[in-house]
Amino acid sequence: MTIANRILPHAPADHPPVPVPRVGVLLANLGTPDATDYWSMRRYLNEFLSDRRVIDYPIWKWQPLLQLIILSKRPFTSGNNYRSIWNEERDESPLMTITRDQVRKLRAAVETRYGAGNVVVDFCMRYGNPSTRDVLDDMLAQGCERILFLPLYPQYAGATSATANDQFFRALMQVKRQPAARTVPEYFARPSYIEALASSVERVYATLDTRPDVLVASYHGMPKRYHREGDPYHCQCQKTSRLLRERLGWGPDSIDTTFQSVFGTEEWLRPYTVEHVVQLAEAGKKNIAVISPAFSADCIETLEEINGEIREAFEHAGGESFTYVPCLNDDDLHIAALLEVVEENLAGWID
């Protein structure tokens, strides 16, 4: 990291270096374990499942169950799942690899838009590394006096966008000199985001010999109770699917909206993806495609769960062709959509 410093003509000779003032753009995603061994997985899962935004059961009830039972077994199974998709060359999860690529491309686009050295673009993870606090400290050291915080979740949910913001605010509470700060709201309805989604579907469909009978839009699930308590996530997922269908020019029954990654015994948003694809196969729809509009980058939930477990369930039920449409990742249209979000939210700070 190279830091350019200002020369202060009226400062005493022993005055510490003062960085050139900059604007920061800090992207945030969910997180990833550092490795696939038991203790790395346990640390990661403990941080994730101890988040009150994710699991809001009473602490006295949840923590004994988590520490004594869940974290004694789940790190083994989760570690095996991560090993099946691990980027061995870089020794990191695909989410980490893809997020680095996204930031590299967005950084170049921001530099083209605002000039070299004026805006610092970096990323953090809500759970695991790089932590929000560590990256915030690094950005402050580079002279960022204003920071735009961008959770990479197109749809808002308390368990994703809000907890990322919480962690950013907690990090701000721990620094002596706070920068000006803004957070970016959900962006699921932006035409540029919908265009990127639609284009990804069209590219994949163009490679297929036979058009799938249906496109399943699988979103990460959450307890139905959270929806009843006011979380807008379910509504935003439904609208995302509708906007995607309208942009593609498809009929009303061409996209099914489902929810995955159910955890625990509580009722979650339905229909469940794994059950729905089985029902499709049993109903004679043997050729399907699946897309994950809520994930900005491919990760354990898409590469292992959708393209592994859910694919297997579909094929076991008699399905013949299962096409997975990758996440937007570092696709140029996705980066352009993110740049548009950044430009809009930096207005008044830098032009």
Swiss-Prot record:
Catalytic activity: heme b + 2 H(+) = protoporphyrin IX + Fe(2+)
Keywords: Cytoplasm, Heme biosynthesis, Iron, Lyase, Metal-binding, Porphyrin biosynthesis
Enzyme class: lyase
UniProt-annotated location(s): Cytoplasm
Any Pfam family hit: Ferrochelatase
Main location as per UniProt: cytoplasm
UniProt GO molecular function: ferrochelatase activity; metal ion binding
Pathway: Porphyrin-containing compound metabolism; protoheme biosynthesis; protoheme from protoporphyrin-IX: step 1/1
Entry protein name: Ferrochelatase
CDD domains, A to Z: Ferrochelatase_C, Ferrochelatase_N
Biological role stated in the UniProt entry: Catalyzes the ferrous insertion into protoporphyrin IX.
SUPFAM superfamilies: Chelatase (SSF53800)
Entry EC no(s): 4.98.1.1
